[in-house]
Amino acid sequence: MLNTDGIVIRPATEAELPLLEELARRIWPDTYGKILTPGQIDYMIEMMYALPVVQKERAEGVAFELILDGEKPVGFLSYGPYKDEPPTMKLHKLYLDFGYHGRGIGSMALQHAIAAAKRAGCRFLRLNVNKNNAAALRAYQRNGFYQAEAVKVDIGGGYFMDDYVMEVKL
């Protein structure tokens, strides 16, 4: 059911960047609680969402956008340049409060990222998704993404990201 009334996607301001970590701490246990250990969840949130990390990525051209229900932040996404040949954008993050799943908002956010990639002249939009995140895999496939490769990335601390790399041709 598509119910995106009142949902807005807009760039996060500098002052709102700390919200990304807050949202991740709220959303990740529902998303990854049956896939990753609590220790790995904490490690990855600190590694990816600490304010200096987000500020550095933003300075490198990564866009951070909030998904709002009215004024209430309910999710976020980030995307940015990936490689020049062929021109490809990377969707780094897309997370939505569990209570907002199944309403078409994730697809709305994906289409938003696809439109940004097209505006940037990209031919592909690429992302990584945990191999065991069945709901996300289905959502990406419904939006035209296909599996390009499988990767296992050592992220330090004794943890790995065991992902599929998916992409959509634009």
Model-derived segments and their meaning:
Residues 88-89, 123-126, 130-137, 141-143, ...:
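C-terminal "cap" of GNAT-fold acetyltransferases
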